[in-house]
Amino acid sequence: MKKVLMGISVAMLLAACGTTSTNGANTTNTTAQTPQTTQQVHVEVKTDGAYTVKEYDFESNGKNLYARAFVPEVEGRVPLVIFSHGLGANVEHEEEVQKALAKAGIAVFSFEFAGGSSSSAPMSEGLTTEMSVLTEVQNLKDAIRIASGMEYVDPQKIYLMGSSQGGLVTALTAEEVTNIAGLFLFYPAFSLPDDIRSSFPK
């Protein structure tokens, strides 16, 4: 059932984004005041001939974060989906969905939250004990600013996607930024605030 729902979600996303590229040079701004952020492309690998895999490092809240993008091999600018993983996951979370979008002509920028991965070898800096929904909101704001400025991105077609805790973070962030074309949330953890209150009553 989960795969069926994912397939339906991807189909809806494809319909919403469209895959027509554009050569426009507009920029996307966020209302958030974020720290100075840097980007560095350090790897570029061809995959399947349908897309290029690019890896990035950028800074958020004083932590170095790892990001990976699937960029379609097409001319001009393309729609962009910025993906936020769930608690304890990483950029490979829902990877098949990311690849399917890239093969359909939609770029996907996925990053690892600071302290948000339970991997024994996390790609981003930060401790789990230092991570919260609010720190992840800031991470996503910085990711939006970085990704929206990429040369292959159509700034009028930037979408946010998140799953589980990443879905909650995506929804909260969308309330504070501008020029986001749409949201796609997979089983968002909207119950998390109530769960925490019930676990730690006053």
Regions found by a protein language model. Give the residues of each.
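Conserved alpha/beta-hydrolase
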Residues: L101-P122
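Alpha/beta-hydrolase fold nucleophile elbow
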Residues: Y152-S163
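The serine-hydrolase catalytic nucleophile loop
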Residues: G88-K99, F113
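C-terminal motif of bacterial Sec signal peptides marking the signal peptidase cleavage site
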Residues: A15-A16
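Hydrolase active-site cap/lid region
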Residues: L172-K202
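N-terminal cap/lid segment of alpha/beta-hydrolase-fold proteins
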Residues: Q36-V74
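Active-site glycine-rich loops that stabilize anionic/oxyanionic intermediates
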Residues: V78, S84-A89
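Alpha/beta-hydrolase active-site loop
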Residues: T129-E151
